[in-house]
């Protein structure tokens, strides 16, 4: 059996190394090239065995810092005789938990140079570290060395390699490795299969994941909660809500209890698809099954309720979350603050803002952006500007969205001149302005009758390396209509079609539809009913006409 496994694994190893270019040795970075490692030379080399045993205890290793771990290794390799390989493995495992994979690889090489004989556990640690560093070829080299020494790979070995392949999106190689192991009578555990299914789902190959799922069931391998959760996530991300719900039911029928991750994934999917009622029912089902919702579950549901203007229910859910001992984080606060601001209840949003500070949570750029926009929407320009000024005082860096909100708010509230001062300052500071920034200013100019200035700015976009989107075009066309510049409107319309921006009803977003409706209204009010308007009505904006 061992010889059969070794021969098959060697063939697989040889094929994979050749496919990926020149075979590489398993040599790993020397200590001089490992930034995390320090000098090995110490003033004293006398180390007592009792001291080492105490430092290698589970209690000490549990919270060990990297520098202390390297010091301990240095003392271990100076000790005579060397500590057992079990002790070295325990230390290496502790460093793995720190995610310092390159350090583990270097220490493993040092052990080899010193003649400290590895066991299967050591090889598995090093293979896993190479895989975590996205160096699957080097992991395969270690596998080859391990086989030459007569060690038989176990489930951990195969699981690590499968994970390594999947991390590199080499799912077919992962499947091939598992198939080869099965051929020779080796039975990988569900962990290896789960890694493959999860990888297929994350690369949008959900149908392949389902086929693989059915195949392992036929082989008599029982899926677990991780298997189902990966599939539920994959289906949700592919907008296959019904299939995900059926899979959840199938899971329960097979007496595999879903966990909070499974439920949260499906609940979030329902929310994003506008199925808030189903999301609430799923939440209630979780509670009935004694599965405690976590911060992700609550935040998803709060977000869904806010998106559908059920702000009071969202607030109640927030209070329930806190009462259950689930501490609200900045994301959950931002979600509810945004809901209040959208509902024109910015003062309620401010209460939450102050509550965050009282609870020791630090507001971020998103928090400030949300409240600044909320004040502008409420018509409180002074408060919005004051809040913007506070950002610098509290060390919160504004991003491009902050400035876009500021420009839009000023323009919408009749403060174009102030907006232009800020816009000019942004240009002087060579900020990375996006199409939203320019569209906002163009809209503000058109709104105040400065169509020529808007047209000049629009025409300069290509020189700035920016491409107008449908919002930019529609905004500019609307402004031109007010000045009776039909020739320019028709030219822009033709350009939009050439750019492929004239979408059909199926692909228009809600914002695009609203803009199209506004444009049609503007053209009708200006007395235009040429073939252009007829074309727009019949082709692009059937949905928009319902808004007229």
Curated annotation (Swiss-Prot):
User: Which family does the record claim for this protein?
Assistant: Belongs to the PPR family. P subfamily.
**PPR repeat boundaries on the chain:** 84-118, 119-153, 154-188, 189-223, 224-258, 259-293, 294-328, 329-363, 364-398, 399-433, 434-468, 469-503
List the NCBIfam families: PPR
**The organelle targeting sequence, given as a residue range:** 1-43
Got a GO cellular component term for this one?
A: mitochondrion
Please tell me where this protein is predominantly located.
Answer: mitochondrion
**InterPro entries on file:** Pentatricopeptide_rpt (IPR002885), TPR-like_helical_dom_sf (IPR011990)
| Compartments where located | Mitochondrion
Q: Which cysteines are joined by disulfide bonds?
A: none
Pfam families assigned to the protein according to its UniProt record, in alphabetical order = PPR_1, PPR_2
Q: Does the keyword Mitochondrion apply?
A: yes
Name the keywords, alphabetized: Mitochondrion, Repeat, Transit peptide
Query: Does the record carry Mitochondrion as a key word?
Result: yes
- The protein here is known as Pentatricopeptide repeat-containing protein At1g62680, mitochondrial
| Taxonomic lineage | Eukaryota, Viridiplantae, Streptophyta, Embryophyta, Tracheophyta
